[in-house]
Amino acid sequence: MKKLFGTDGVRGVANVYPMTAEMAMQIGRAAAYIFKNGKKRHRIVIGKDTRLSGYMLESALMAGICSMGVDVLLVGPLPTPGIANITSSMRADAGVVISASHNPFEDNGIKFFSRDGFKLPDETELMMEELIFSKRIDSLRPTAKEVGKAYRIDDAQGRFVVFLKSTFPKDLDLSGLKIVLDCANGAAYKVAPAVFEELGAEVISIGVKPNGTNINADCGSLHPEVMSQAVKEHGADLGVALDGDADRVIFVDEYGNVVDGDRIMAICATEMIRQGILKQNTLVATVMSNMGLDIAMKRAGGQVIKTAVGDRYVVEEMLKGGYNLGGEQSGHMIFLDHNTTGDGVLSALQVLAIMQRHQKRLSELALVMEPLPQVLVNVRLAEKSDIMQVPEIAKLINDVEEKLKGEGRVLIRYSGTEPLLRIMLEGSDEGDIRCWANDIASIVAQKLGGEARG
């Protein structure tokens, strides 16, 4: 069982175990040992978002990697998908991202990409942990010319802008569109506005003044109300909101209504079916996706395959089945024809291309899917346990499932990145499912000593 790595790398409060400089250095040493193979000079890319603690962790990781005789390529603040892309395009041995994605600035994280730009498999992360905790590489200390060097890649952002624009159809541009763009004071604060402006859009940018502590603070994809208000104030055609590391995106239409990841996947997947380019007419989503997505895909002649929550599991299923589109309700979308991981700006470009090609507003395109009412309630628990072993909880859940009569569902799962139990209900009557979700959350909190949060 993994001790350090969760569903999206190592994550926690910066400067508190395991997110300390000492552990970052150990992780760097273990990674360098694993990716070092043969006599040639090896290179690992390090990128980050705009958190204050990024400087500390970047320096520690760099020291650990160089101390094992591996060179480091520093790209500075860059979206997570940009780090994956540059790792692959520069033929580096691995890429490291220092980010806690949509979490507040106090948190930070470390996650890896392999040389092909995909996230590491569980086995490699387990190997890294074994090297750290067994201390068996502590005595390995290259000296003299064998010590690694660090280089700064000054044009990393420009390279990624060029790549992103290359994914947009050559016969289209964004002229005539007014876009509100919220970069969450995060990693895409320079890249995203440049991409949309260079393609011809009028861009109203918010969340583009990072100061180390304002990443995701009342802005970005977790706060679409900010972008929604700006769209209405400026009479914009739509709003695009990224999270701190720009691997996810949420939209609002011209009326300020939120268009989430499920609807975006429905728009893109049905368009790809029409063009004959959706492989096996199959979309890969997670168990959190609304049943309305399944209905929309079936109507278009496609199907949805569901995985566990986490974009890494979506990508694994896509690679295993040979599919080219997948994503999550939260706004992670993977277009494998273009990139290897969730990419907020790239996903936005694909939606904008559909709007421009068909000369339709986002509100029109969003009608392709009608979501079933869905309610999510979180319970903060001190530790994870099997709630179905508590008779009162199990009975209530079974009773609710019986009431839904196959026209909805109950999904209960632990978060992979936070100490939360997520209780999600779908059904035709929002009042009923909200009441039942709160009932389940209350009894879980009562029996297991937690705190319910609607």
From Swiss-Prot:
Record: active site: S101
Key words of the record: Isomerase, Magnesium, Metal-binding, Phosphoprotein
Cofactor(s) recorded for this entry are: Mg(2+)
What are the BP-aspect GO terms?
carbohydrate metabolic process; peptidoglycan biosynthetic process; UDP-N-acetylglucosamine biosynthetic process
- Provide the reaction this enzyme catalyses: alpha-D-glucosamine 1-phosphate = D-glucosamine 6-phosphate
Position of the signal peptide: none
Copy out the cofactor comment: Binds 1 Mg(2+) ion per subunit.
Class of enzymatic activity (EC top level): isomerase
A molecular function (GO) held by this record is: phosphoglucosamine mutase activity
Q: Which residues bind Mg(2+)?
A: S101, D243, D245, D247
Q: Which residues carry this modification: Phosphoserine?
A: S101
Q: How is it modified after translation?
A: Activated by phosphorylation.
Q: What's one GO-annotated cellular component?
A: cytosol
The EC designation for this entry is 5.4.2.10
Q: Which PROSITE patterns match?
A: PGM_PMM
Q: List the disulfide bonds.
A: none
**Family note:** Belongs to the phosphohexose mutase family.
The task this protein performs is described as: Catalyzes the conversion of glucosamine-6-phosphate to glucosamine-1-phosphate.
> What is the designated name of this protein?
Phosphoglucosamine mutase
Q: Which gene encodes it?
A: glmM
